[in-house]
């Protein structure tokens, strides 16, 4: 038997500090064998295509200091996770790049001589010991797969299940949702949307222009049995605290 902790979109440095602290404490408590980051690790507003939508893009020498500062801020937060993962001796670590993370790669496509700014290189994933997957490349362990997230809309969990046709866990949409189906040969299969760890306030999400959302703070625990089957626990984080196996964890 092995256990994994799965975290959804963090959007560092626009994260919810109390939610992140809950997850860090949960890692210490659970002591997982596997750690899976579903991506959108950074907000990456410095390289967002929306940044210069209504104004002219400045010369590169004006862009780089802001990009460098955001990379530094994101790495500082990743370091916090690596520190606690090292402490509990969790060696198997996976990173599944998200669409926001892909913005760094798009920046490098425009500036191919700046390869050090790719998401993989800027966050030093290989150096950190993570197995790296590009945006929506699928990770499969036993009888469940993991991906950043490919579909949105009201029925995104159902759409992920129908398109992938297997047990699938993803982030991307920031809400907690599940859809299940039964197949004649495969039995019950499900899709889990895992919420986010992002600051959900209107002040930090001005692009919503005051619209309400259905986002939730959460993380997942997956227990893998020797048969390849598994058990999923979606742990909701409510106002900076959660209940985990009879223990109250406060961020």
Feature map (PLM): residue ranges:
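A short acidic (Asp/Glu
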Residues: 16-17, 45-49, 104-109, 157-158, ...
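Polar, enzyme-active/binding microenvironments
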Residues: 29, 233-249
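Hydrophobic/aromatic residues located in beta-strands of well-ordered beta-sheets
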Residues: 35, 93-95, 191
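Active-site neighborhood of divalent metal-dependent phosphoester bond hydrolases
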Residues: 47-135
């Amino acid at each position: 038997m092995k256990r994994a902790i799965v975290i959804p979109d963090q959007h560092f440095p626009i994260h919810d500090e109390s939610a992140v602290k809950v997850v860090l404490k949960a890692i210490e408590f659970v002591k997982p064998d596997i750690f899976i980051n579903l991506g959108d690790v950074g907000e990456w507003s410095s390289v967002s295509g929306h940044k210069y939508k209504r104004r002219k893009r400045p010369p590169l020498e004006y862009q780089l200091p802001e990009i460098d500062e955001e990379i530094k801020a994101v790495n500082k937060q990743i370091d916090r996770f690596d520190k606690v993962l090292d402490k509990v001796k969790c060696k198997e670590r996976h990173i599944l790049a998200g669409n926001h993370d892909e913005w760094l790669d798009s920046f490098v496509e425009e500036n191919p001589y700046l390869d050090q700014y790719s998401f993989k290189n800027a966050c030093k994933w290989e150096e950190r010991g993570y197995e790296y997957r590009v945006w929506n490349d699928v990770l499969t362990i036993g009888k469940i797969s993991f991906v950043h997230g490919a579909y949105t809309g009201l029925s995104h969990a159902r759409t992920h299940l129908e398109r992938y046709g297997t047990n699938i866990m993803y982030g991307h949409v920031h809400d907690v949702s599940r859809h299940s189906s039964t197949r004649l040969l495969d039995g019950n299969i499900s899709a889990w949307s895992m919420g986010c760890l992002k600051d959900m306030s209107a002040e930090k999400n001005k692009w919503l222009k005051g619209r309400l959302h259905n986002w939730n703070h959460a993380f997942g625990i997956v227990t893998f049995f020797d048969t390849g089957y598994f058990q999923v626990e979606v742990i909701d984080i409510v106002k900076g605290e959660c209940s985990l196996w009879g223990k109250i964890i406060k961020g």
